[in-house]
Protein backbone atom coordinates (compact mmCIF):
# COMPACT_ATOMS: atom_id res chain seq x y z
CA UNK A 1 0.00 0.00 0.00
CA UNK A 2 2.81 2.43 0.88
CA UNK A 3 4.46 1.66 -2.47
CA UNK A 4 1.22 2.50 -4.27
CA UNK A 5 0.90 5.81 -2.40
CA UNK A 6 4.49 6.74 -3.21
CA UNK A 7 4.03 5.74 -6.87
CA UNK A 8 0.87 7.85 -7.17
CA UNK A 9 2.69 10.85 -5.73
CA UNK A 10 5.76 10.44 -7.94
CA UNK A 11 3.76 9.92 -11.13
CA UNK A 12 1.52 12.90 -10.35
CA UNK A 13 4.59 15.08 -9.96
CA UNK A 14 6.02 13.74 -13.24
CA UNK A 15 2.78 14.50 -15.09
CA UNK A 16 2.66 17.99 -13.63
CA UNK A 17 6.31 18.50 -14.58
CA UNK A 18 5.67 17.36 -18.16
CA UNK A 19 2.89 19.90 -18.59
CA UNK A 20 5.03 22.85 -17.48
CA UNK A 21 6.34 25.47 -19.86
CA UNK A 22 9.69 27.09 -20.46
CA UNK A 23 10.29 30.70 -19.58
CA UNK A 24 12.91 33.17 -20.79
CA UNK A 25 12.87 35.12 -17.54
CA UNK A 26 13.41 34.09 -13.94
CA UNK A 27 10.94 31.60 -12.57
CA UNK A 28 9.15 32.42 -9.33
CA UNK A 29 8.82 29.57 -6.90
CA UNK A 30 6.66 29.12 -3.86
CA UNK A 31 7.69 27.24 -0.76
CA UNK A 32 5.21 25.09 1.06
CA UNK A 33 5.31 22.28 3.55
CA UNK A 34 3.96 18.92 2.43
CA UNK A 35 1.18 17.81 4.77
CA UNK A 36 1.70 14.56 6.62
CA UNK A 37 -0.63 11.88 5.26
CA UNK A 38 -1.62 8.97 7.44
CA UNK A 39 -1.19 5.65 5.72
CA UNK A 40 -4.71 4.35 5.78
CA UNK A 41 -6.72 2.72 3.01
CA UNK A 42 -8.90 5.84 2.87
CA UNK A 43 -5.87 8.09 2.35
CA UNK A 44 -4.62 5.92 -0.50
CA UNK A 45 -7.87 5.83 -2.48
CA UNK A 46 -8.98 9.37 -1.62
CA UNK A 47 -7.65 10.89 -4.88
CA UNK A 48 -9.98 8.54 -6.70
CA UNK A 49 -13.11 9.20 -4.68
CA UNK A 50 -13.35 12.75 -3.48
CA UNK A 51 -14.60 15.49 -5.82
CA UNK A 52 -13.49 18.17 -3.37
CA UNK A 53 -9.92 16.88 -3.70
CA UNK A 54 -10.26 16.95 -7.51
CA UNK A 55 -11.38 20.57 -7.32
CA UNK A 56 -8.47 21.47 -5.02
CA UNK A 57 -5.93 19.73 -7.29
CA UNK A 58 -7.26 21.59 -10.34
CA UNK A 59 -6.98 24.94 -8.58
CA UNK A 60 -3.49 24.12 -7.36
CA UNK A 61 -2.28 23.01 -10.79
CA UNK A 62 -3.78 25.90 -12.77
CA UNK A 63 -3.97 28.71 -10.19
CA UNK A 64 -7.54 29.29 -11.41
CA UNK A 65 -10.73 29.30 -9.37
CA UNK A 66 -13.37 26.67 -10.10
CA UNK A 67 -16.80 26.26 -8.61
CA UNK A 68 -17.70 22.62 -8.95
CA UNK A 69 -16.86 19.18 -10.23
CA UNK A 70 -18.87 16.55 -12.07
CA UNK A 71 -17.79 12.92 -12.25
CA UNK A 72 -18.44 10.69 -15.27
CA UNK A 73 -17.68 7.12 -14.26
CA UNK A 74 -18.15 3.96 -16.29
CA UNK A 75 -18.63 5.37 -19.79
CA UNK A 76 -15.00 5.05 -20.91
CA UNK A 77 -14.23 1.35 -20.69
CA UNK A 78 -11.37 -0.83 -21.91
CA UNK A 79 -10.78 -4.40 -23.01
CA UNK A 80 -8.86 -6.78 -20.75
CA UNK A 81 -5.17 -5.87 -20.40
CA UNK A 82 -5.53 -2.97 -22.84
CA UNK A 83 -5.34 0.79 -22.87
CA UNK A 84 -6.43 1.14 -26.51
CA UNK A 85 -9.46 3.38 -26.93
CA UNK A 86 -12.39 1.69 -28.64
CA UNK A 87 -14.85 3.56 -30.87
CA UNK A 88 -17.37 3.40 -28.00
CA UNK A 89 -14.87 4.89 -25.56
CA UNK A 90 -14.11 7.74 -27.98
CA UNK A 91 -17.83 8.46 -28.33
CA UNK A 92 -18.19 8.57 -24.55
CA UNK A 93 -15.26 11.00 -24.26
CA UNK A 94 -16.69 13.14 -27.07
CA UNK A 95 -20.07 13.30 -25.31
CA UNK A 96 -18.40 14.89 -22.27
CA UNK A 97 -15.69 17.04 -23.85
CA UNK A 98 -17.29 18.38 -27.05
CA UNK A 99 -20.00 20.46 -25.29
CA UNK A 100 -17.38 21.98 -23.00
CA UNK A 101 -15.09 22.90 -25.88
CA UNK A 102 -17.96 24.28 -27.97
CA UNK A 103 -19.18 26.40 -25.02
CA UNK A 104 -15.62 27.75 -24.64
CA UNK A 105 -15.81 27.30 -20.88
CA UNK A 106 -12.91 27.45 -18.47
CA UNK A 107 -12.62 23.86 -17.30
CA UNK A 108 -10.09 21.32 -16.13
CA UNK A 109 -10.22 17.56 -16.65
CA UNK A 110 -9.03 14.96 -14.20
CA UNK A 111 -8.65 11.47 -15.67
CA UNK A 112 -8.54 8.58 -13.21
CA UNK A 113 -7.43 5.24 -14.68
CA UNK A 114 -8.83 2.05 -13.15
CA UNK A 115 -8.31 -1.69 -13.61
CA UNK A 116 -9.90 -4.91 -12.45
CA UNK A 117 -8.18 -6.92 -9.71
CA UNK A 118 -6.73 -9.53 -12.07
CA UNK A 119 -2.93 -9.39 -12.01
CA UNK A 120 -0.27 -7.82 -9.83
CA UNK A 121 -1.02 -4.53 -8.09
CA UNK A 122 2.04 -2.78 -9.60
CA UNK A 123 1.11 -3.92 -13.12
CA UNK A 124 -2.47 -2.75 -12.62
CA UNK A 125 -1.24 0.61 -11.38
CA UNK A 126 0.78 1.10 -14.58
CA UNK A 127 -2.13 -0.11 -16.73
CA UNK A 128 -4.46 2.39 -15.04
CA UNK A 129 -1.95 5.16 -15.72
CA UNK A 130 -1.66 4.11 -19.37
CA UNK A 131 -5.46 4.23 -19.67
CA UNK A 132 -5.59 7.76 -18.22
CA UNK A 133 -2.80 8.83 -20.58
CA UNK A 134 -4.61 7.31 -23.58
CA UNK A 135 -7.69 9.40 -22.81
CA UNK A 136 -5.56 12.48 -22.24
CA UNK A 137 -3.76 11.94 -25.55
CA UNK A 138 -7.04 11.49 -27.42
CA UNK A 139 -8.50 14.71 -25.96
CA UNK A 140 -5.32 16.61 -26.78
CA UNK A 141 -5.19 15.32 -30.37
CA UNK A 142 -8.91 15.55 -31.08
CA UNK A 143 -9.71 18.86 -29.38
CA UNK A 144 -6.35 20.56 -28.91
CA UNK A 145 -7.05 20.94 -25.20
CA UNK A 146 -3.76 22.04 -23.61
CA UNK A 147 -2.15 19.38 -21.45
CA UNK A 148 -1.93 21.81 -18.54
CA UNK A 149 -5.74 21.74 -18.41
CA UNK A 150 -5.70 17.99 -17.70
CA UNK A 151 -4.36 15.74 -14.97
CA UNK A 152 -4.19 11.98 -15.33
CA UNK A 153 -3.28 9.39 -12.75
CA UNK A 154 -3.91 5.78 -11.82
CA UNK A 155 -6.16 4.34 -9.17
CA UNK A 156 -5.19 0.83 -10.28
CA UNK A 157 -7.46 -1.78 -8.73
CA UNK A 158 -8.15 0.22 -5.55
CA UNK A 159 -11.57 1.65 -6.46
CA UNK A 160 -13.77 -0.99 -8.12
CA UNK A 161 -17.35 -0.15 -9.05
CA UNK A 162 -18.32 -3.81 -9.35
CA UNK A 163 -17.37 -7.18 -7.90
CA UNK A 164 -14.23 -8.65 -9.47
CA UNK A 165 -15.43 -12.25 -9.03
CA UNK A 166 -17.50 -12.16 -12.23
CA UNK A 167 -16.40 -11.32 -15.76
CA UNK A 168 -19.06 -8.58 -16.06
CA UNK A 169 -17.84 -6.94 -12.85
CA UNK A 170 -14.22 -7.01 -14.00
CA UNK A 171 -15.27 -5.43 -17.31
CA UNK A 172 -17.03 -2.59 -15.47
CA UNK A 173 -13.88 -1.94 -13.41
CA UNK A 174 -11.66 -1.46 -16.49
CA UNK A 175 -12.37 2.21 -17.02
CA UNK A 176 -11.28 5.84 -16.86
CA UNK A 177 -13.30 8.19 -14.70
CA UNK A 178 -13.56 11.69 -16.13
CA UNK A 179 -13.94 14.49 -13.60
CA UNK A 180 -14.92 17.82 -15.14
CA UNK A 181 -13.99 20.76 -12.97
CA UNK A 182 -15.62 24.09 -13.90
Model-based region annotation:
Residues 17-20:
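C-terminal motif of bacterial Sec signal peptides marking the signal peptidase cleavage site
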Amino acid sequence: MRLTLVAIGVLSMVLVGLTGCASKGPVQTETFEQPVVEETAEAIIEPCTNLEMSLARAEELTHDTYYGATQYDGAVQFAFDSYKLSAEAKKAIDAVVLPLVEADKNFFLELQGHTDAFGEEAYNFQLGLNRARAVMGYIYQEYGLPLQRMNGFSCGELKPVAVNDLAQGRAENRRVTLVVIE
